[in-house]
Amino acid sequence: MAAPAPRPLPVAGAARLLCAGRVLELEGAVVMGVLNITPDSFSDGGLYLDPAAALAHAEAMAEQGAAILDIGGESTRPGAAAADSEQEIRRVLPVVERVAARLPLLISVDTSNPELMRRAADAGAHLINDVRALRSPKAIEAAAAGNLGICLMHMRGEPADMQREPQYAQVLVEVRAYLEERVRACAAAGIDPQRLCVDPGFGFGKTTAHNLELMRHLEDVATLERPLCVGLSRKSFVAALTGRAAGERLAGSLALATVAVLRGARIVRAHDVAATVDAVRVANAMRRELH
């Protein structure tokens, strides 16, 4: 008896991202390595506050195959308070400058701070990764004034309160509608849509059930005609599924990353770069075969 034909896999609506004069080709998914310049991030807070330590870790992630390095100076873990603007700038810019001078990979700045957005381009950044999707005052104007790529993420509430019993009537419908609205807002501000990617915001104002519902139907977000970014690494909902502490969630994180790529994700944000690169390469190969 002949084997049944494989079910077609989702195809993301865009396979490239414009980032400050460079083009990120996304025919296959790539890995974005995480570099937190914070004292209180849930997984690696305090490890890379020294610029030399941050650069060494950036070099290691580049060697392991990261295509993008995401540098952040404000913790957005559940319950985190907002960072002081000037403090965030002082943490991030020296590291961006050092990395830009030493490494050829794309540099993302994880921020909602419009002043940091403006200054990051001059420091050598290529991409803004904003958990607030340019909703902060003056953020969309700051982004429109430059030419950096922009990742628009969905978050219900703020980090300080986002996990206090988040509720949705239909989480997939609401997340998709929010991201569509933010893409339209960027277009209205004069931002080229080819500079945009979108992120459904796993773990940001969502219960484990919400996260699983989004993952089951991720292909419906991947049809927004912009590249899809996902952040799944070491998240608390991995702990809810596995019972593992933050430093022991690699296997669960890799399983989710693989599923995400098969369902249309093009950028996978990760702390454990080497292992995630391997998982993404396997998932990319599976996508090619099944198409």
Residue ranges, per PLM feature:
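Active-site-adjacent loop and "lid" segments of alpha/beta metabolic enzymes
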Residues: 3-4, 8-11, 19-20, 26, ...
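Phosphate/pyrophosphate-binding loops at sites that engage ATP/ADP/AMP, CoA/4′-phosphopantetheine
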Residues: 62-63, 182-195
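Catalytic domains of carbohydrate-active enzymes, especially glycoside hydrolases
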Residues: 56-72
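Hydrophobic "anchor" residues on beta-strands that sit immediately upstream
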Residues: 32, 66, 106, 126, ...
